[in-house]
Amino acid sequence: MDIETKKVIEQILDNNKIVLFMKGSKLMPMCGFSNTAIQILNTLNTDYFTYDILENENIRQAIKEHSSWPTIPQLYINREFVGGADIMLELFEQGELQAQVETLLAA
């Protein structure tokens, strides 16, 4: 990962409490997993930032390196990597994702 790409990722994570690196946008997810992630986040009724990795190949590869996770989408809460769509769904079904967001908003 080059220094400039690392800086971009760090800036995105620094400037946003909840970040979803995904394929496509909130309004037009470009894969089923990104769509699942968006649906989960929309259910939480909170603000979140999305980054379309299809717009930048360097970010697309670097975010996988940054998280040591091979797939997209990737959710970060308070700079911490949470997981992809399956982990998000599992945490959501257990009420843990909502709890993480509520803790973040209460801080």
Curated annotation (Swiss-Prot):
InterPro entries: Glutaredoxin, GRX_PICOT-like, Monothiol_GRX, Monothiol_GRX-rel, Thioredoxin-like_sf. Transmembrane segments: none annotated. [2Fe-2S] cluster binds at residue 31. Gene3D superfamilies: Glutaredoxin. Residues 6-107 form the Glutaredoxin domain. The keyword Iron-sulfur applies. Its main location: plastid. Belongs to the glutaredoxin family. Monothiol subfamily. This is Uncharacterized monothiol glutaredoxin ycf64. It comes from Porphyra purpurea (Red seaweed). The lineage of its organism: Eukaryota, Rhodophyta, Bangiophyceae, Bangiales, Bangiaceae. The gene is ycf64.
